Amino acid sequence: MNDKIVRATAKNGMVRIIGGITTNLVNEGSKIHECTPVAAAALGRMLTAGTLMGTTLKGEKESLTLKINGGGEAKGITITAHNDASVKGFIGNPYVTRELNDKGKLDVGGAIGKDGLLYVIKDLGLKEPYVGQVPIYSGEIAEDFAYYFTVSEQTPSAVSLGVLVDKDLSIKAAGGFIVQMMPDADELLADLVTYRLEEIPPITTLISEGKTIEEILEFIFEGMDLNILDSIEPSYKCDCSREKVEKALASIGKKDLQEIYDDGKNEEIVCNFCNTKYSFTTNDIGELLKNSIKK
């Protein structure tokens, strides 16, 4: 089944929904970073949140960065997303291992930790990016984003993010949704939506059963005039290039470049997001140095 993100409304626009299946995307990210099961679950939840939230951006030059670091052994996760539902990310320690939590589930909250902040950074092409931050609520990620939306954006929200890791470490199912109540929605509607969300099986169970994201949302919002607005296929996509790496290397300054050149060793730079290796010979460093001196 292909991954898909849909945007929808229910109850005449009183409920706003973004939902998606992200199994292939999360599998790609987990493979790139060679994640353990708990690392794959943590990274996958963040990637899913990123691709869902990225679709709310208006322009293709806008970007969204999500960061969470609670002092746990995962050593933080960073995600960057765009409005075409493309996303990339990295986890500080992809080899983190934890015992299962008291519910018999992967202990994402323990791996992330609670002693830190969740950051949401929106670069909308203005002079300064918008930066929202909240204390980490549980480290389970979905609850942390629900807390962020409610506290920082004053939008009561329910967030579900799930990743099911198979025995061979591939991703069996991944997906999630963000459900937000509009300001004019009445409390009875909010209570009904909350009740429905509490009663449904985990989203990974529904995906594993072969349900599409449309079928999942129709199941949740049955009798509530669900209206699917649009859909898009998400992807794990890194936009790194040798040219960008050269610019980053040149930006460290002439003094540091000169030291690297004087060492006479080849330099290798690895992209955090996709692990692509970029090699620079002494001659390459010399050219960068020469160009920086000209400037």
Curated annotation (Swiss-Prot):
- Give the location in the cell: Cytoplasm
Keywords from the named record: Chaperone, Cytoplasm, Disulfide bond, Redox-active center, Zinc
Any GO BP annotation: protein refolding
* Principal subcellular localization: cytoplasm
Q: Which cysteines are joined by disulfide bonds?
A: C238-C240, C271-C274
Q: Which GO terms describe its cellular component?
A: cytoplasm
Describe the processing and modification events after translation.
Under oxidizing conditions two disulfide bonds are formed involving the reactive cysteines. Under reducing conditions zinc is bound to the reactive cysteines and the protein is inactive.
Pfam families documented for this protein? HSP33 (PF01430)
GO molecular function annotations of the record:
protein folding chaperone; unfolded protein binding
**Primary role:** Redox regulated molecular chaperone. Protects both thermally unfolding and oxidatively damaged proteins from irreversible aggregation. Plays an important role in the bacterial defense system toward oxidative stress.
- Family stated for the protein in its record: Belongs to the HSP33 family.
Q: What is this protein called?
A: 33 kDa chaperonin
Q: Which organism is it from?
A: Clostridium botulinum (strain Alaska E43 / Type E3)
